[in-house]
Regions:
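Active-site-facing substrate-recognition patch
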Residues: 1-66, 75, 102-132
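Residue-level recognition of the N-termini of beta-strands and the immediately preceding loop/turn
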Residues: 64-66, 97-100, 164-165
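Conserved beta-strand elements of the Class I
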Residues: 66-68, 137
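Glycine-rich phosphate-binding loops at beta-strand->alpha-helix junctions
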Residues: 71-81
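Short, solvent-exposed amphipathic alpha-helices that sit
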Residues: 80-89, 151
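Hydrophobic alpha-helical packing residues
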Residues: 89-93, 156
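A short coil-to-beta-strand element that immediately follows conserved catalytic motifs
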Residues: 93-105
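PRPP/pyrophosphate-binding module of the type I phosphoribosyltransferase fold
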Residues: 104-210
Length: 211
């Protein structure tokens, strides 16, 4: 877990990107968990982890909090990835749950295609009542550089949020492993990896949250 001022970040597992090869069994398992999550395929145990960490953050004071989801590249992707988790949290907590607080004004390519630094804050629309005077929990699948989280959190704070806290399934790591041949979506893998590692090291050097 990483905490700074009125922000905090928690994650469950570590994610090794698919452009690495030679992963061990644990790394392969966690990679599958993340990729399945992206497709909306996850079990009750994983949803329970999010619920338990929401409880830890709110300390039982659920009424001054709001749970939102970081935006996917389209409404369809948002529903596919987070729809089941949204419904579970609505049924099992008393906190406000908002699937579509944030969205892109114009269609956005997935951030791992365009590069994290190219995300346009002005392209993110925000439903202000979901965050105004609230302690906001932002949920997403992976935190890599923290760019999307930080920019979205900045916008929410400008619109009156009291604090911002991130809950992520996984944190991206870059182990000392060989890389596969470059694919069409990552033309400059080496520089992106160096940038991701540098930013993430500044963000946090702590281990993943206990399961």
């Amino acid at each position: 877990m990483y905490i700074k001022n009125n922000h905090s970040i928690r994650w469950k597992i570590q994610y090794v990107p698919t452009y690495y090869e030679g992963l061990n069994e644990d790394q392969e398992r966690d990679q599958r968990i993340v990729l399945n999550f992206k497709d909306g395929n996850y079990n009750d145990d994983l949803m329970l982890w999010f619920r338990q960490n929401i409880w830890k953050l709110t300390e039982g004071d659920e009424y001054s909090w709001s749970v939102c989801f970081l935006p996917c590249s389209s409404d369809e992707e948002q529903q596919k990835r987070f729809g089941k988790l949204e419904q579970y949290l609505k049924e099992n907590t008393r906190i406000e749950i908002h699937l579509s607080t944030f969205g892109y004004v114009e269609k956005q390519e997935p951030s791992h295609y365009i590069g994290k630094s190219d995300i346009d804050l002005m392209n993110i629309a925000l439903h202000v009542p979901d965050v105004y005077m609230k302690n906001v929990i932002l949920i997403d699948d992976i935190i890599t550089t923290g760019e999307t989280f930080n920019r979205t959190a900045e916008q929410a704070m400008r619109m009156g949020a009291n604090s911002i806290h991130g809950l992520f399934l996984a944190k991206t790591i870059h182990p000392d492993l060989p890389m596969k041949e470059k694919n069409s979506h990552r033309e400059d893998d080496d520089s992106i990896i160096r940038e991701e590692a540098e930013i993430m090291n500044k963000l946090s050097n702590l281990p993943p949250e206990d399961n």
